[in-house]
Amino acid sequence: MTAGSVCVPQIIPLRVPQPGKANHEIDNNTLLEMKSDTPDVNIYYTLDGSKPEFLKRIGYGENNTFKYIKPITLPDGKIQVKAIAVSKDCRQSGIVTKVFHVDYEPPNIVSPEDNVENVLKDSSRQEFKNGFVGSKLKKKYKNSENQRSWNVNLRKFPESPLEIPAYGGGSGSRPPTRQSQSPGFAHVSGQKCLTSTEIMRIQRETDFLKCAHCLAPRPSDPFARFCQECGSPVPPIFGCRLPPPEGAQMGLCAECRSLVPMNTPICVVCEAPLALQLQPQASLHLKEKVICRACGTGNPAHLRYCVTCEGALPSSQESMCSGDKAPPPPTQKGGTISCYRCGRWNLWEASFCGWCGAMLGIPAGCSVCPKCGASNHLSARFCGSCGICVKSLVKLSLDRSLALAAEEPRPFSESLNIPLPRSDVGTKRDIGTQTVGLFYPSGKLLAKKEQELASQKQRQEKMSDHKPLLTAISPGRGYWRRQLDHISAHLRCYAQNNPEFRALIAEPRMGKLISATVHEDGCEVSIRLNYSQVSNKNLYLNKAVNFSDHLLSSAAEGDGGLCGSRSSWVSDYSQSTSDTIEKIKRIKNFKTKTFQEKKEQLIPENRLLLKEVGPTGEGRVSVIEQLLDEGADPNCCDEDNRPVITVAVMNKHHEAIPVLVQRGADIDQQWGPLRNTALHEATLLGLAGRESTATLLGCNASIQKKNAGGQTAYDLALNTGDDLVTSLFAAKFGQGLEDQLAQTRSLSLDDC
């Protein structure tokens, strides 16, 4: 709200909230009050839905605007009220609109000398009998005590417009000409009692801290269920918990042996169910028992100390309490007094209770309900726990005691021997208890643990092998781990600060690290890392390996030159190819271990890899790459000691062969009693293994490798008689011959 603006007026019906009716549903006897929070303003209103015009003069058209002077009533029907507040300097507020559904009710005549406060007070008393709450209206009228002597004359809708002064003119108004009528607070005698839902709704809308029937303050006990003045039920406070236990509601849990309240479903210490513990476990009853004077617990007669509080029990001669029933009341006639602990009646002159030994005559700060034993206020008329009338019972007990005292007063010469509690009950002893299965650390123990954690953290920080913070300059001097940390940290920082390098390094898919070199030139240190590239395409089917240097050396050393037979060329080519592959493996540091050297256990990744290339798998390249990235071994074997590459060949998953070879799988690994390689198995499959044979030859599988029978894969292809498979080996041999011929031709030209 801006400074200097006028607050909009409020249109408030002056009535008690009616159950089942909305705020806009009123009758023709209900007064409407209009007020604004801005002081010294005039309120103008209309009742036909038109805009209030306070500057319009008489004689210039129809004027339906009225000036508010006192609370008004509305005619029956649907009435739309619009009001505006105007200050003395003609500053206007916003227009507020309210629609009321007005019902017709016959008017109730009230004497003129009754003011609004008396009417409210009388109507509140009548409404409270039926469950209405008027505390909210009392608060509302308390804020306007300066209008205590309101004139409640009814101002009905006038027949002619009200005269309104022009701008800057004097103020004047026509006095009301209607007779006075009473406001609509009359109580209907035939109204039915309210339901609990209606009472809850009225209390939620008005004041839940007061009784809905007698408007008395709510009992101080938040768990009281009945009003202590009228005895009607009091709705519970929202979000209340279990009531606090009384003294007699505490007991020992059978599981943890802790003194816990017994009015809860489970033990608050060990969470054991208490319902089963409260049921009697046997039908045996004590024939004789001794009541403890300290806590009032019944104990077996042969015990000397109480089983509950461990206090000394009176001897059998002193105790007159045996059996399950209380001893008879004293036979002497006269006044009696009730014990506040066990409820037994004792003589007026008794200092202690003859049943439980409690001291009598202690002024109680609260009254105890004789039915449920709950504590109530001294002035309470009804019990807040069970709802019975406490005043009447107390009065009856007092009348009875007075009648007995008046009938035959007790002579003072008579004496009554009542066992008093001895001061020297026994020597005090320190008894230690132990809770089995439970441990509660103390504050000292927790502080000690915190100190140990802090000292351990300090020791770890001071350790020599603790990872230090990275610096701008690497340490050098043989600290290769710190050097690698320095390289990785600065490489990450460089990638974060250079988008171009970040985009380039994020694109390729890299495998294992093949080689790494370090070069120093005095100013800079160059580090080169070579990784194997991974792609979904088959990069090994048509890959030609340049073995010119090795073939050249073999051709120069040969005595027959080009005049040798085809078999000699094939053997030379195969031997040179195998030597070259071994050298490449040594350069790339492929450390392959055969099954005879080390038998590895199948880890989950290896098991999934064998399943993917097995008969039930699909041989998906992406899945195989993911498993290899997660740590699967490309040289693992199944239960039959077959390498994974051989399993892929036998199950016709030729797409997985290049991926396994790239990740370090031994392509010439032998298995079984026949010592066959993957190329042998692919050749034995015939046409079904033609694609696997071509893939293995493209990955430089050894043709010269022999099995246990002394046969190469080419020999097996010739035995099967499959021309398509044999042509693959011939193409491989032809490529080798062409390379050797080209190398020999270049040597002869150099000699010339």
Curated annotation (Swiss-Prot):
GO terms for biological process: eye photoreceptor cell development. ANK repeats lie at residues 605-636, 640-669. Residues 174-183 have a biased composition (Polar residues). It is found in: Cytoplasm, Cytoskeleton, Microtubule organizing center, Centrosome; Cytoplasm, Cytoskeleton, Cilium basal body. Pfam families: Ank_2 (PF12796), DZR (PF12773), Fn3_assoc (PF13287). Its main location: cytoplasm. One of its GO terms (cellular component) is cell projection. One of its GO terms (molecular function) is zinc ion binding. Keywords: ANK repeat, Cell projection, Cytoplasm, Cytoskeleton, Metal-binding, Phosphoprotein, Repeat, Zinc, Zinc-finger. Disulfide bonds: none annotated. Residues 164-187 are annotated as: Disordered. The modification Phosphoserine is found at residues 160, 182. InterPro entries: Ankyrin_rpt, Ankyrin_rpt-contain_sf, DZAN1, DZR, Fn3_assoc_repeat. Coiled coil: none annotated. Gene3D superfamilies: Ankyrin repeat-containing domain. A zinc finger (DZANK-type) spans 211-270, 339-387. Interacts with NINL isoform 2. Associates with DYNC1H1 and multiple dynein intermediate and light chains as well as actin-binding proteins. Involved in vesicle transport in photoreceptor cells. This is Double zinc ribbon and ankyrin repeat-containing protein 1. It comes from Homo sapiens. The lineage of its organism: Eukaryota, Metazoa, Chordata, Craniata, Vertebrata. The gene is DZANK1.
